[in-house]
Amino acid sequence: MSVPFYAKSETNQGYSKNMEVVGFSDLNGVNAFQMALYKTGEKYYMYCGSFKGAGVNIVDVTDPTKPEVVGCVYVSDPNIYFAQSTPKVQVADGLLIVALGGGVTFLHGIKPGDPADDGLQIYDLKEDPVHPKLLSHWHTGLPNGMGVHRFAYNGGKYVYMPAECR
């Protein structure tokens, strides 16, 4: 592992104050945005939404000194939906909830109306947290738009969200 820019080293006083970096993963070159932790048995998995991309990385963080990317949930075909963004994820009650929408022009270099799937996808983590099973996909009715961005799911029957919808 090369030393990340924020880690304390001989040539760097460190970026994180009052914390110590104990492990690092470049997530196989995929950026991450919101993350959510899931514990099952003795294993810990971190699900990482992508600010620009059609997937959610699954990282085994059971040993925090050696985080390992063990899978990815692809929410749509990146060859079709090249403007896809999956920035927000939530985990509770053995469910992974993923927000889908289009990227932002000034951040991602896409144009309004570029193809992106929309809505929320709900996955079951209980059977196999490395290969989540898609349970449902709620569509906003406005594909290629902003879709769902911030939302809250703490378990139970309801997801609370703002969405561009019809």
Enumerate the language-model features and the residues they cover:
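Feature marking well-ordered beta-strand scaffolds used for ligand recognition
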Residues: 1-166
